[in-house]
UniProtKB/Swiss-Prot annotation:
Organism: Homo sapiens (Human)
Region (Disordered): 29-49
Name assigned to this protein: Iron-sulfur cluster assembly 2 homolog, mitochondrial
Phylogenetic placement of the source organism: Eukaryota, Metazoa, Chordata, Craniata, Vertebrata
Function as written in the Swiss-Prot or TrEMBL entry: Involved in the maturation of mitochondrial 4Fe-4S proteins functioning late in the iron-sulfur cluster assembly pathway. May be involved in the binding of an intermediate of Fe/S cluster assembly.
Chain residues that bind Fe cation: 79, 144, 146
Transit peptide boundaries: 1-8
Name of the encoding gene: ISCA2
Cellular location(s): Mitochondrion
Top-level division of the source organism's lineage: Eukaryota
Known disease link: Multiple mitochondrial dysfunctions syndrome 4: A severe disorder of systemic energy metabolism, resulting in weakness, respiratory failure, lack of neurologic development, lactic acidosis, hyperglycinemia and early death.
Pfam family, one: Fe-S_biosyn
Length: 154
């Protein structure tokens, strides 16, 4: 079943938040700093910004409660060298940037932000999978067909 969901939506480790279809669970972790840390409410992706699509905002409002948000991380791996990792979280760290639009929040750590600044976060729903995805990443040279792996521009 994990292959059907792809690696673009990865479960976190602390507590079950929302059941996904077919028993898939998203899990999460967060602290009281969340509201103070919101640093971007602009829908336009400028220098160092992440833009959220309407479908991303809508899905996040459906699956998050209270101080929960979507965390986007970039890790080494995948077929192209780097891969996107999504999880629900509740803890905002000192090096995190918070991007908020329409009440939905996406948080990116400073190391990962260097690999995704100027990109869009989208939620795609298809017959074979539903997932959050990074689109139009100006830092990516190429990606693979799965949509979760990419190589960077040098």
């Amino acid at each position: 079943m994990a292959a059907a969901w792809g690696s673009s939506l990865t479960a976190a480790t602390q507590r079950a938040v929302t059941p996904w279809p077919r028993g898939r669970l998203l899990t999460a972790s967060l602290g009281p700093q969340a509201r103070r840390e919101a640093s971007s409410s602009s829908p336009e992706a400028g220098e160092g910004q992440i833009r959220l699509t309407d479908s991303c905002v809508q899905r996040l409002l459906e699956i998050t409660e209270g101080s929960e948000f979507l965390r986007l991380q970039v890790e080494g791996g995948g077929c192209s060298g780097f891969q996107y990792k999504f999880s629900l979280d509740t803890v905002i760290n000192p090096d995190d940037r918070v991007f908020e639009q329409g009440g939905a929040r996406v948080v990116v750590d400073s190391d990962s932000l260097a690999f995704v600044k100027g990109a869009q976060v989208d939620f795609s729903q298809e017959l074979i999978r539903s997932s959050f995805q990074v689109l139009n990443n100006p830092q990516a040279q190429q990606g693979c067909s799965c949509g979760s792996s990419f190589s960077i521009k040098l």
